[in-house]
Amino acid sequence: MVNPRFSVNVDRVRAVSRALAGIGWDGFVRLDMLEPEFNVLSEVYHRVGDVRVLLVLGLSAAIVDYQLAGDAFRFWNTLQKVLAKRGFKLSSIGDIRAVMGEFLNYPVNARFNSTKRGRVAKFFNSGFADFLWDRAYKYYSDRPTEIWYGLAKTLGNRPDQKTIVFAMKVLDLISLLVNGSYANFPRDVPIPLDVHVARMALYSGIVKGDGSEISERVIQRNKEIFLRAWGDVAERVSEMLGRRISPLRIDSLVWQLSKEAQKASYRRNHAIRYIIRYLVDVANIDGNVAKNVAQELTYKMPY
């Protein structure tokens, strides 16, 4: 049941959307290219040059990118080390499955390891990897919804489950890497909702509620509210820019800036400085825009 203490704050959605629109299309693309998974996928593509490898490897890794003993950077950097150790030999589905088997032995994947192995086994044993390798690589960018719902069905998950949606973000980044444009996802594709993204919804004020209460249980009970709030932000930013800004783009921004806020122990004055510095120095965003984004995303954060 939805907790009545959590609700979408339309006024804050408007304010946050205005700030984020200042980032512009190119800014959102640069933020996507700073994602840890993009760096690894880019190296694989430049070494192997096969979109089939990117799809099978990227999606099979994405479905186990949760409950990490570390963070996403450690997860994807570890995968990169496994690939380098094998000389980036990735000429078949069997090669990729062997990589995933070795990757799951590493400490970053220690939590829920048997469950993760089961998910990877389903991915390969069900024929889904073969589907990507034999057919879907030809049209993954034009018809991503077929892959999205097919993956959810294969793993017995809802299409809006975090790891399923995150896998689609990986597909979207593969399309950007290979084609120079994003995949043709429908407007209702949700943001991959995790604790970081939910917490920033509360700290920005787009969701009314107490940030100290945030937990996986609270998120799941109020999932529709968090998804709607960020979805509304994406819609408004799209209207302001005159170009489609998917919630998957918003995710890159919010996730990266949540890590900066975390470094500042979620104290507003420090978080604002960290966020501005990151946006300006790392993402090459205008200083005034960065200041507006930092102030709006930390609006409800304690001092």
Where are these regions (language model features)?
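HhH-family (HhH-GPD) DNA N-glycosylase catalytic core used in base-excision repair
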Residues: 1-303
